Amino acid sequence: MIKILITEFIDAQALQNINKEFEVIYKKDAWQNKDYLEKEIEQFDGVIVRNKTSLDKNILINASNLKFIGRLGVGLDNIDTEYCKNNDIIVQPATGMNADSVAEYVVNTSLTLLKKTIIINEETQKGKWPRTSIVTKELKGKILGLIGFGDISKKVLNLVNVFDVTCIAYDPFITSKQMEAENVKKVSFDEILNLANIISIHVPLNNETKYLFGRQVFIKMKKQP
């Protein structure tokens, strides 16, 4: 039977389902023990990780029987994908599985910031009712800038349409025609910084995107949404 190591927390129902098909070793804290991974990974056919487990070359070089790595999420920056590619180890992220949840989070956070919900809640708990001292803003009429135009950005787009929001996007891999089909205008990175009231980032972490947002980028942004 195929033997799988799970190195981080996983939902009980999901674990039960996996146990029906495979021999599973569930060690939710294994991600913290690099020595364990280096010594024990050779006995497994597959590994399931989240974002905390680092599977670098020093660990993978010991994985003589490893055939696949399942990533519960979409980011692959914690896995040496180049080593996996060169050694016929399949790496499978859960692409799109959390798109709805992330999109809802983006809209919720945008509304929370514009409506200053946290500040008002804190004041209310103190027995105050800041009806005039705290000024809030509407999402309606704002310009939303999307960095990356994949599954999650499209989900965000669907949710904000009801707020009469204008959406612009930057993605070097998506054409203007493709964006126009979604009623989105393709713009440059700098244009998003200058135009957008809200910026939402949906790109993988890699050498090209690491440090994409630094001090000089924040300086270029609008100071008020």
Locations of regions flagged by a protein language model:
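Short, flexible loop segments at the rims of nucleotide/cofactor-binding pockets, characterized by
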Residues: 22-29, 46-48, 123, 175-182, ...
